[in-house]
């Protein structure tokens, strides 16, 4: 093919095509079909403009011989074939002198007679498919599109073909000649299919032997052989009526394609019921930290030593009492468990040498809280397969819950800035390859925007707790180990700080499978009075354990300190993902990068610096009942991060289902906004699939309510 291109096209065209490919890092020797396509496109652009001039009266004329009359002006400005910078310079100067709207993408020609840019397409497929792809890409009323095919068909905007019959016939003849020349050399099939990105390998080898028999066995019903099936598939025209296609495929399918209009979608139905409750593995906005600055005590970095040191910074402990009981639990046991923790920490201090880990005494309250001996005895299946009425436990349907306002508050808090930095600059990780300059600049800007974010604190807290719990689960399977919940950060002045949120006591943890559960009791400090939103704390027993002096604008005030206690559980696989929560930083960084890329491609230069440093510009963050919310680029970074972190903290099957199904509806609505006239069938079924995931999960319910806000504003 490469030889053919060099023989068939003018050397100037070949040179321009090579240059264009090199600019995009493509190799003409390897991507030969692309090489041929670029040459063909260049030649069509040049032929389009050849011999067309504008005379002194401004009329369009065709001059074929080298007329010495110098007053003629070329009718078309050729943009295709110039290097990008030069091409944009030409486009800008045309726009400045004629007042024509600047196109988003580089067009191929400018027509001085009709005063419009022209996009030329040459396709090996059907012209109207290619025309639609072009129109969708450039999305501009102003740029005129003209498509030619190798079979002599053409299509142009509003059937306005710009040139006279004869000029277009010259182009069609040339394309037909190229096609015949390729075909005579056996190059045409590969060239024709490469546009669709089809793989042409299988035409060159036959499937034989076992593979052939397997292929014949695995055909859909009613097909006798692979050939028979292949012929059927090849007969599928890619365009045409979907209903017809479906009925061709199966007699049982009768889908009516309904147009999807602004009035079609309805809001998602959120469940009724009592308000949903907090289900995260640790407290988020309600957490309270006991902290030490610039820790330098003996054994600093050993969690138990750090925890004891943090506990000693607080002097307001008092006799604990229950202020919000857990509806279903034996509440005195929760109270006894906390007293036991205090007593055993006191015992440690009385010892000569503080141990590195602490295993709690297996008291009755801890055995109850950790579900010790509660699991039904496992019986070998062999011993009971003859029992006639052997059946699984009936499990109750989960109770439907309604959306509560606390989860939106949790999310807002996660987007806020704290006064400490939770990650160092290199936390997102160096690139393995020699990292490009731009990528590291972006990473540093992004890190600066999110290092103080509360969502980042949740990441580090999650990583710490899951790592500690997984370690203890493997190292001390039978013990009720006491695990402090710790995080580390830096203050504004750059001083190190160690924080204690509370404690976890883990139960027996013989985790053979990824999904085997380890129970734990969490006890977390807080200043939030649980009686303000009792529904949020349904799964907790809350004790009042002390009084804390807080500095406020009016001086010192004393506030009760609470301890939120609950039984919880997790598994190896959940802890493994919890340890990987730093990935949320990477995910949100990639989302921001794609925004920068989009901006840069419009402006034709790298926009990283402007993107982060132009403080006046606002960006869309999300939808609320008030409309589209906007904010600074930092706010966008933190919101994307918080979403990613909440997807991790509140991961659940309901979220998986909701994300997958609602995305389909989202794409349909976006297609409607882009005027692509989407059609749907069984929209009711899609709504059912989405709504069956809306049961009781706070994060899913919040996302569904955001989705409804989006629907309202998108369809106005």
Curated annotation (Swiss-Prot):
Motif (Nuclear localization signal 2 (NLS2)): 184-247
Subcellular location: Host cytoplasm; Host nucleus
Gene3D superfamilies: Influenza RNA-dependent RNA polymerase subunit PA, endonuclease domain
Annotated residues for binding of Mn(2+) 2: 80, 108
Motif (Nuclear localization signal 1 (NLS1)): 124-139
Cofactor notes: Binds 2 manganese ions per subunit.
Record-listed E.C. numbers: 3.1.-.-
Cofactors that this protein relies on: Mn(2+)
TM segment ranges: none
Any single GO BP term: cap snatching
Similarity remark: Belongs to the influenza viruses PA family.
Protein's name according to its UniProt entry: Polymerase acidic protein
Organism: Influenza A virus (strain A/Swine/Hong Kong/126/1982 H3N2)
């Amino acid at each position: 093919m490469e030889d053919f291109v060099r023989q068939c096209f003018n050397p100037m065209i070949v040179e321009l095509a090579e240059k264009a490919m090199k600019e995009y890092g493509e190799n003409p020797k390897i991507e030969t079909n692309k090489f041929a396509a670029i040459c063909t496109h260049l030649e069509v652009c040049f032929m389009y403009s050849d011999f067309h001039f504008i005379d002194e009266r401004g009329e369009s004329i065709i001059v074929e011989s080298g007329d010495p009359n110098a007053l003629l002006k070329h009718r078309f400005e050729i943009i295709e074939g110039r290097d990008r910078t030069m091409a944009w310079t030409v486009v800008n100067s045309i726009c400045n002198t004629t007042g024509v709207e600047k196109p988003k993408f580089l067009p191929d020609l400018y027509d001085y007679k009709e005063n419009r840019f022209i996009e030329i397409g040459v396709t090996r497929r059907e012209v109207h498919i290619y025309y639609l792809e072009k129109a969708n890409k450039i999305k501009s009323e102003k740029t005129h599109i003209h498509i030619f095919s190798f079979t002599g068909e053409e299509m142009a905007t509003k059937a306005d073909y710009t040139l006279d019959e004869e000029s277009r016939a010259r182009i069609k003849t040339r394309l037909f000649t190229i096609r015949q020349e390729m075909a005579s050399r056996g190059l045409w099939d590969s060239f024709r299919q490469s546009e669709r990105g089809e793989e042409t390998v299988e035409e060159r080898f036959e499937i034989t032997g076992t593979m052939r028999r397997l292929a014949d066995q695995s055909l859909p019903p009613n097909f006798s052989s692979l050939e028979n099936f292949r012929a059927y598939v090849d007969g599928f025209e890619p365009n045409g009526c979907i209903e017809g296609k479906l009925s061709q495929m199966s007699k049982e399918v009768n889908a009516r394609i309904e147009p999807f209009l602004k009035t079609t979608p309805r809001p998602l139905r959120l469940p009724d019921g009592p308000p949903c409750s907090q289900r995260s593995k640790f407290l988020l906005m309600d957490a309270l930290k006991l902290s030490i600055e610039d820790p330098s005590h003996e054994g600093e970095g050993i969690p138990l030593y750090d925890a004891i040191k943090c506990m000693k910074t607080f002097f307001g402990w008092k006799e604990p009492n229950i202020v919000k009981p857990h509806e279903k639990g034996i509440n005195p046991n929760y109270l006894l468990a906390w007293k036991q923790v205090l007593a055993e920490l006191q015992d440690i201090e009385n010892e000569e040498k503080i141990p590195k880990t602490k295993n709690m005494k297996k008291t009755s309250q801890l055995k109850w809280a950790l579900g010790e001996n509660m699991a039904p005895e496992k019986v070998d299946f062999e011993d009971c397969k003859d029992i006639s009425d052997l059946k699984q436990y009936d499990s109750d349907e989960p109770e439907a819950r309604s959306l509560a306002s606390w989860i939106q508050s949790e999310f807002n808090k996660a987007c806020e800035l704290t006064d400490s930095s939770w990650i160092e600059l290199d936390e997102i990780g160096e690139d393995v390859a020699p990292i490009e300059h731009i990528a590291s600049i972006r990473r540093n800007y992004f890190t600066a925007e999110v290092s103080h974010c509360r969502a980042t604190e949740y990441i580090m807290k999650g990583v710490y707790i899951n790592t500690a719990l997984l370690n203890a689960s493997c190292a001390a399977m039978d013990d009720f180990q006491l695990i402090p919940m710790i995080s580390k950060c830096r203050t504004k002045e750059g001083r190190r700080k160690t924080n204690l949120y509370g404690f976890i006591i883990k139960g027996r943890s013989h985790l053979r499978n990824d999904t085997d559960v380890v129970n734990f009791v969490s006890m977390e400090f807080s200043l939030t009075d649980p009686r303000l939103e009792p529904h949020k704390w349904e799964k907790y027993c809350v004790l009042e354990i002390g009084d804390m002096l807080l500095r406020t604008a009016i001086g010192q005030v004393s506030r009760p300190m609470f301890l939120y206690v609950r039984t919880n559980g997790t598994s190896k696989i959940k802890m493994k993902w919890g340890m990987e929560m730093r990935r949320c930083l990477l995910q949100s960084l990639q989302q921001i990068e794609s925004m920068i890329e989009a901006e840069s491609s419009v402006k034709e230069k790298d926009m990283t610096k402007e993107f982060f440093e132009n403080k006046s510009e606002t960006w869309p963050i999300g939808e609320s009942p008030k409309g589209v919310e906007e904010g600074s680029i930092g706010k966008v970074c933190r919101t994307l991060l918080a979403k990613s972190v909440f997807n991790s903290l509140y991961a659940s099957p309901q979220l998986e289902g909701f994300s997958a199904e609602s995305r389909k509806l989202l794409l349909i609505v976006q297609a409607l906004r882009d005027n692509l006239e989407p059609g749907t069938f069984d929209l009711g079924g899609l709504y059912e699939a989405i709504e069956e995931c809306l049961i009781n999960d706070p994060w899913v319910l919040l996302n569904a309510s955001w989705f409804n806000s989006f629907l309202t504003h998108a369809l106005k």
